[in-house]
Design a protein with these regions (language model features):
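A recurrent flexible, glycine/aromatic-enriched loop bordering the glycosyltransferase active site
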Residues: 240, 248, 299-328, 340-341, ...
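Conserved donor NDP-sugar-binding/catalytic core segment of glycosyltransferases
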Residues: 267-300, 470-515
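Short secondary-structure "cap/edge" segments that initiate or terminate local elements
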Residues: 1-46, 51, 55, 59, ...
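Acidic donor-binding segment of Leloir-type glycosyltransferases
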Residues: 195-235, 435-438, 442-453
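C-terminal, non-catalytic tails of nucleotide-sugar-dependent glycosyltransferases
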Residues: 130-168, 385-427, 515-540, 544, ...
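Glycine-rich, basic loop-to-helix element that forms the pyrophosphate-binding segment
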Residues: 233-250, 450-458
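Short aromatic/hydrophobic "clamp" motif used to bind/position activated sugar donors
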Residues: 255, 463
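Catalytic donor-sugar/metal-binding loop of nucleotide-sugar-dependent glycosyltransferases
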Residues: 340, 350-369, 395-408, 563-565, ...
Length: 642
């Protein structure tokens, strides 16, 4: 539930005495601070305290706080805490106007009680109240990857999808699986999951690179289905070589890439074929959502993917397993070689998308990636070479496109940071700010403009929308320029970190009611959020109207150059550009910092995009493609929809 002044009062209304006295104190929430190494766990929390004061009440008293160290009845230390004023709000209580001053108090995790006083009002926070607030915070920020109810959620989806009849007609689906020293139990489960497919027009091509493994041979001998082809190779050719050998024996219209110890849902092929049959233009590539399973087939860690997202793909192979490609397209590209061993699916994804064929995402968990000793899923460090192969896959992709860029490995396993050359000379930047940019941002702009061309009408035209509270350094602005001047980009929004070290902006989505929802707000800036989403570039429907770099030449082409005057019109410009096939890029490699405090409460008056624009340009009910239908669209932390 969103934490607002209304929700705080709903939980604990003002008493008659408080209304009569015209003052009150309430604890709104707590959030983890950004202090310390994130991996070490919380070092401290911000406690959000509200001071209510009736309009006719005299000037407020000073708010004070004492924090008590130690868990016993007698404290081992006392510390005076300096409150930080965050915001002032105006509310109506019983038709009367009240002012609400919001303060944050920073307490370490070994301070288990605090006393807050303001005038005659006092608030004691400790024991049960403190623990309850911390638990509530944990529930608020939890995401799908740690949801203990995920197996039950998956079972409901299984029941819904199993009830759908499989297509009676459709393409021949080839499935290619390189197998090397596969544990027999997992090999059998892999084959059985294909035999259980509700869609029957398939062939399974297994390349056995362990022909002397008697346990594997015994498993193969159990099956007499003519749709299963076992191709034996006397030597292990590696993942790419074995896969390519299997491709040579595939005869289907589409080819799915399948690992030797994983499983798929019995309706996996049916869902793919359904989408293929329903498409006016046959898709070139299809992919689905997935999760992990342990050695006992217990599911966990759902990987719920967005629709095709060019910039997200440059940071990680999010398409990953059960990649399915139209076979005639495989004849148009060079098959993956040893240089991308372990990242061959990533390499193939790039090659197929370069052909500009339709890409279809099926937002259902159809694939299960097995975690066991020796698997990449269980320990990514066991196959570190695959991460270097991923770097080469991206570099080769950029080279084929004729794009100058550089790729380095990211902070997390199997993630990458792709950068591009800024244009030379640099384009000039017009600045739009409600007031004057702060001194740090102005210094950045002065340094940039000293190197930029004088005439902004030449080449790509850029405009920076920014508030006086946002500080932007030169390297961050240059990163934004690098990406804003790429083909197809309309806007670039950096991640924004608050004065207290928490996220203010780490991408946003449009909810079904048209409201714009900032994602991962108030998490510590070191927190990657759901599978590292705060750290990955993402093409989005909307950007951040408070801080973004916009291509004004693109705006002019779209006829919206002169219609951008405030945050609302900027949001509508984002949507118009996205509907026209342009990209609004969330760019976490650039960071803006807020210089002034902001509220820890949620906005009760969210801005909305113009649904007439969305429905008019998309012709369909809106579902944000940078998210996933499995997520709760009103939750900023990637929770499962119930």
């Amino acid at each position: 539930m969103p934490i607002t002044i209304s929700s705080v009062l709903a939980k604990e209304t003002l008493t008659e005495a408080e209304i009569k006295n015209g003052t009150a104190l309430r604890l709104a929430r707590c959030v983890r601070s950004a202090e310390g190494e994130f991996s070490e766990g919380p070092h401290s929390y911000y406690w959000d305290v509200l001071r209510f004061q009736a309009e006719e009440h005299p000037s407020p008293s000073k708010l004070t706080c004492l924090a008590f160290r130690g868990e016993g009845r007698l404290p081992t230390g006392i510390r005076k805490v300096s409150p930080t004023k965050l915001a002032t709000h105006e509310v109506k209580i019983d038709s009367a106007s009240w002012r609400v001053d919001e303060y944050s108090l920073l307490l370490s995790t070994n301070e288990h009680r605090m006393l807050v006083k303001c005038g005659k009002d006092s608030l004691i926070i400790g024991g049960g109240l403190q623990g309850a607030a911390i638990r509530e915070y944990g529930e608020i920020i939890s995401n799908a990857s740690v949801d203990e109810n995920y197996p039950a959620w998956l079972q409901k989806r299984r029941e819904a999808l199993s009830s759908k009849p499989a297509p009676s007609e459709g393409p021949l689906m080839s499935i290619v699986t390189p197998a090397y020293k596969t544990p027999p139990a997992f090999l059998k489960k892999m084959i059985d999951s294909i035999l259980s497919q509700s869609y029957g027009n398939w062939e399974l091509v297994i390349v056995n690179a362990s022909p002397d493994d008697e346990n594997m041979r015994r498993v193969f001998n159990e099956y007499a289905d003519s749709r299963i082809k076992v191709i034996e190779t006397p030597e292990n050719l590696g993942i790419t070589g074995n896969t390519n050998l299997g491709l040579a024996h595939c005869t289907g219209d589409y080819v799915s890439f399948y690992d030797h110890d994983d499983t798929v849902e019995p309706y996996a092929l049916a869902e793919y074929v359904r989408r293929i049959n329903d498409s006016d233009v046959k898709p070139g590539l299809l992919y689905c959502d997935e999760d992990n399973i342990d050695e006992n087939d217990v599911p966990s860690l759902p990987l719920l993917k967005p629709d095709y997202n060019e910039d997200f793909l440059l940071s990680n192979d999010y398409i990953l397993h059960w990649l399915t490609v139209r076979r005639d397209l495989l004849k148009m590209v060079e098959l993956s070689g040893k240089d991308v061993e372990g990242a061959q699916d990533y390499d193939m994804t790039f090659k197929i998308t370069e052909l500009s064929q339709p890409v279809i995402h099926i937002p259902e968990v159809l694939y299960h990636w097995r975690i066991h000793s020796g698997s990449t899923a269980g320990d990514p460090a066991q196959k570190a070479y695959t991460q270097n192969a991923g770097t080469r896959a991206i570099k080769n992709h950029l080279a084929r496109l004729g794009v100058e860029g550089d790729v380095v490995r990211g902070r997390a396993f199997f993630t990458y940071v792709t950068s591009f050359e800024a244009p030379s000379p640099l384009p000039a930047i017009d600045v739009f700010c409600d007031g004057d940019p702060n001194s740090a941002t102005q210094e950045t702009l002065n340094a940039y403009n000293a190197a930029a061309i004088a005439d902004s009408a030449v080449g790509k035209r850029l405009a920076l929308w920014i508030t006086p509270g946002h500080r932007l350094k030169l390297n961050d602005l240059l990163t934004m320029v690098q990406h804003a001047t790429r083909n197809g980009v309309f806007s670039v929004s950096p991640r924004v970190i608050r004065a207290d070290g928490l996220f203010d902006y780490a991408n946003s989505i449009v909810a079904p009611d048209g409201t714009v929802r900032k994602l991962l707000t108030l998490l510590p800036s070191q927190d990657g959020g759901y599978v590292g989403r705060s750290e990955r570039p993402m093409d989005a429907v909307v950007g951040n109207p408070e801080c973004c770099l916009v291509r004004m030449d693109v705006a002019a082409d779209l006829g919206i150059e002169h219609g951008i005057s405030d945050n609302k019109s900027m949001l509508d410009a984002f949507v118009t550009a996205w509907c026209a096939g342009k990209r609004n890029l969330y760019m976490p490699y650039a960071t803006a910092h807020l210089s002034t405090p902001r509220t820890l409460l949620e906005d009760e008056n969210r801005q909305r995009v113009d649904f007439d624009i969305l429905s008019g340009l998309t012709g369909r009910a809106f579902d944000d493609p940078s998210s996933n239908p499995a997520f709760n669209p009103f939750d900023p932390y990637y929770k499962l929809a119930k």
